[in-house]
UniProtKB/Swiss-Prot annotation:
Protein name: Tachykinin-related peptide 3
Alphabetic keyword roster: Amidation, Neuropeptide, Secreted
GO cellular component, one term: extracellular region
Gene Ontology BP term (one): neuropeptide signaling pathway
Modified residues (Arginine amide): R10
Keyword ATP-binding assigned: no
Subcellular location: Secreted
Length: 10
């Protein structure tokens, strides 16, 4: 799951 929006998944 994303930690902070979209780029949180990278």
């Amino acid at each position: 799951a994303p930690s902070s929006g979209f780029f949180g998944t990278r």
